[in-house]
Amino acid sequence: FISMSFNQIFRKRMLEYPPEKTINCHAGKLPFYRGRNILNWALINDESEFGITVHYMDEGIDTGDIIHQKLYPIFDEDDYFSLLERAYSGCAELLYQAVKLLQSGTAKRTPQQLIHPEGFYCSDRKEGDEILDWNQSSREVFNFVRAICLPGPQARTFLNKNEILSNHVECI
């Protein structure tokens, strides 16, 4: 079985059906970016790169042994949409490579605990998270807006009780 961007947790029975053959493509650098909304958080956190990871699925959330991982640079010109496009094509490429490794019997398993004993989970974005905080630095506002631009909810602020949506900002 292959999973990609699936927002449900598979039951143990489902994971055991094809033993050690259920894999997931995760648009995050595991074990550091587990969970959801990874690309948003990578931008908000001003990361210089994001990862795509193909891993075995287990009962945890994005905790299985890593089969294949590739890192991609994040540029100031990037936003959520551009990272999403790169993640989709990157996941397709890495899944293909991982399946070939599995078929040939040469797939390696890297336990995530060897990289970092605990990992890190990204929280869900909630309603209200899209409101701009003007007390942040200009770099933080820049990262925030590009992290939640379309197809995300867009950054919101208010001026004289009028709502303003922001989809793009530049640091000058």
Regions found by a protein language model. Give the residues of each.
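Donor/substrate-binding cores of folate-linked one-carbon enzymes
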Residues: 2-120
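Internal anion-binding site segments
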Residues: 116-172
